[in-house]
Swiss-Prot record:
Source organism: Janthinobacterium sp. (strain Marseille) (Minibacterium massiliensis)
Domain of life: Bacteria
Gene Ontology BP term (one): tRNA modification
Gene, per the UniProt record: miaA
Name assigned to this protein: tRNA dimethylallyltransferase
Reactions catalysed, as given in the entry: adenosine(37) in tRNA + dimethylallyl diphosphate = N(6)-dimethylallyladenosine(37) in tRNA + diphosphate
EC identifiers of the protein: 2.5.1.75
Pfam families per record: IPPT
Amino acid sequence: MSVKPLVVSIMGPTASGKTAAALAVAEKIPAEIISVDSALVYREMDIGTAKPSAEELAQVPHHLIDILDPLDSYSVMQFRQDAIRLAAEISARGKLPLLVGGTMLYFKGLKDGLDALPQADAALRAELDAEAAAIGYPAMHAKLAALDPITAERLKPNDSQRIQRALEIIALTGQPMSALLAQAPKTELPFTLLPIALEPSDRSVLHTRIATRFDAMLKGGALLDEVKALRARGDLHLGLPSMRCVGYRQSWEYLDGAYSLAELRERGIAATRQLAKRQLTWLRSMDDRHIIDCLAPDASGAILQQIEIAQNRA
């Protein structure tokens, strides 16, 4: 019986140092990085996504970064197919595939499969966008709670993208997403997955990191200039998944005159903290993960130890 190749996932909330840790690991072990980030797939979106720098991208091969125009969407199933294909190609080159990112739905889709869920429907999404514009997402969340209470319970009333997707699935299939996920067959991965989670021992330090990073994005108008350029294209709008990314929505609304620069900063930091909280909630549901303190001075060393243990076990 052939031994499955090892694939390492380095997960964590935003600002937990995933990119730096992965690059440090790749300095010690021949590896390639597969991005697990629903924002990094987009071109023309570098500042607000905290995209790795040109120097970092040159340090080690990266995949699934800058593969889409902001007008396009990228589903969990597309990610799953791409990640499995890339992991096989990287393993065949004799390197270790590192799945690195914070889009927990991608990690879940990769591990568990989402075969039972339908593909996105652009026309239906436009209808849901129009309804949300009329009544607001808290009301859309209440609508979802009546149709799929299990899914609604784990979503915040302002989690527009996931609320829209859950309502879309109900409209397309006549069944709640929670029921479809429960029915979905478990699909075995063609590799052994080592799940590593970078989690903070002190959330206040993570919150400080988040604020510092958002301030750096705003410095000199960098993020606002990026969003101005996106707006100037004329074909993008806040209903698109790309423009719903944290930082972009708030900057767009600021440029619309919805609030002051100080409020943009406050809202951007608050939204990023909410994202980190959701990411940590997802991580806690993954019982098989190996937890490493992202605030530890040698987090990458701890990751390398886990990899060595897994390789020796194979």
